[in-house]
Amino acid sequence: MDSIISAASVIAAGLSVGLAAIGPGIGQGNAAGQAVEGIARQPEAENKIRGTLLLSLAFMEALTIYGLVVALSLLFANPFTS
């Protein structure tokens, strides 16, 4: 029974990293595209747009890091195994 729990934990860890990266990846692509459009329309606002973009990208990347933390806790600090 312990091997089934270990196998399920490995699968869940892989899914948590994969699914946690999908949303922020799409969001980062959209945000970068909109930032490039905004800079193309108003080149004088480049510094303000870039600063806002970098801050929002950091928040989006935090979601992926949370998925990595969940995966690492499932692999190395699993409460379901003895």
UniProtKB/Swiss-Prot annotation:
GO terms for cellular component: chloroplast thylakoid membrane; proton-transporting ATP synthase complex; proton-transporting two-sector ATPase complex, proton-transporting domain. HAMAP family: ATP_synth_c_bact (MF_01396). It is found in: Plastid, Chloroplast thylakoid membrane. It is a multi-pass membrane protein. F(1)F(0) ATP synthase produces ATP from ADP in the presence of a proton or sodium gradient. F-type ATPases consist of two structural domains, F(1) containing the extramembraneous catalytic core and F(0) containing the membrane proton channel, linked together by a central stalk and a peripheral stalk. During catalysis, ATP synthesis in the catalytic domain of F(1) is coupled via a rotary mechanism of the central stalk subunits to proton translocation. Key component of the F(0) channel; it plays a direct role in translocation across the membrane. A homomeric c-ring of between 10-14 subunits forms the central stalk rotor element with the F(1) delta and epsilon subunits. The keyword Transmembrane helix applies. The chain crosses the membrane at residues 4-24, 57-77. In plastids the F-type ATPase is also known as CF(1)CF(0). Its main location: plastid. This is ATP synthase subunit c, chloroplastic. It holds the Pfam family ATP-synt_C. F-type ATPases have 2 components, F(1) - the catalytic core - and F(0) - the membrane proton channel. F(1) has five subunits: alpha(3), beta(3), gamma(1), delta(1), epsilon(1). F(0) has four main subunits: a(1), b(1), b'(1) and c(10-14). The alpha and beta chains form an alternating ring which encloses part of the gamma chain. F(1) is attached to F(0) by a central stalk formed by the gamma and epsilon chains, while a peripheral stalk is formed by the delta, b and b' chains.
